[in-house]
Amino acid sequence: MSVQATLRGRRRAAGTLLAAGALALAACTPAGEGDGDTSGEPDASGAAGTTQLSIATGGTGGVYYPLGGGFATVIGEQVDGYSATVSETNASVDNMQLIGDGGADLALVLGDTAADAVNGEADFEGAPVTACALGRLYDNYTQIVTSADSGITSIEDMEGASVSLGSPGSGTEIIALRILEAAGIDPDSGISRQQLGVAETVEALRDGTIDAGFWSGGLPTGALVDYATTGEMVLIPHGEYATVMQEAYGAYYTETEIPADTYEGQDEAISVVVVPNVLVANPDNMDEGLQEQITAAIFDSREQLTEVHPAAADLDPATAGEVEYMDICPGSQAYFDGQ
């Protein structure tokens, strides 16, 4: 069955940096509470004399949430008249829907999900989303996790197992379904399909209620850092499927490696599929001047943001405008042109 039909050295510093990131977060709001229109005058939604922006992120156990909190901090510090808060969501699919319906002003999103959204494909079939990219951020590594005693050493070994494919409405779920398709496993009949976020996946692995789980995130991911300390975590290599996924869906899927020692007890590099992350906005709801100011605040603050999460070390204005699958926001392009 096709996925279209089915869907319709950093580890060591990670623990303290993720804790610091949590402390750096701006106040968190429920998904969908942004007004989605930042083209007008400041209003009373933020501090006195400021307009409050909503940033759609992901679950608290991943990278989007703390990094989005860092973005909120630098926006509040560097963009006059604006503050920002983060919203916990199921991540990429939810986030693009929030951008489309005005429920969020900014969102962190996987590149493949963003492409589906602007092209009206997969979960967005018949309902394309108007969006532009403020820039490419960092790569998401597909991390397929199991326990040492599961007997699973490859994707093929998952046949008949209980496997989490990520939260419903997440970019992880899209990637998981496409990897299984590339491996010839039907996600509806070939596995016992579960839908859990990364923190819940780790809990279920510890409890023995699932055999394996998919997660797409930056390196290192906090929930996996914690799980690796038990000595039970095993990462499953799968980078060989990147070529098939490129041919079927697009060039944003590539093969790379999770470096050895990214997680405790991980002695060897692991071949995986990666996909870039982008920060997106709705150009109908955000003027070019604000786009440029936000882009500058984020990409000029790489060192500060790296203290929130190590993935921010990959923020690079020299390559951030290289987004082939959707338009760059014109204000962001102006910033990149000036570098």
Model-predicted segments: where are they?
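Bacterial N-terminal signal peptides that target proteins for export
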Residues: 2-18
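C-terminal motif of bacterial Sec signal peptides marking the signal peptidase cleavage site
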Residues: 24-27
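Bacterial signal peptide processing site
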Residues: 29-32
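Bilobed "Venus flytrap"/periplasmic-binding protein-like clamshell domains
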Residues: 52-78, 82-86, 139-207, 322, ...
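Pocket-flanking alpha-helical
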Residues: 69-74, 85-127, 144, 199-204, ...
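Pocket-lining segment of extracytoplasmic ligand-binding domains
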Residues: 111-113, 119-124, 150, 187-285
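Ligand-binding clefts/hinges and TM-proximal coupling segments of bilobed small-molecule sensing domains
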Residues: 161-178, 252-324
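An extracytoplasmic/periplasmic, membrane-proximal ligand-sensing/linker region
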Residues: 200, 207, 217-235, 240, ...
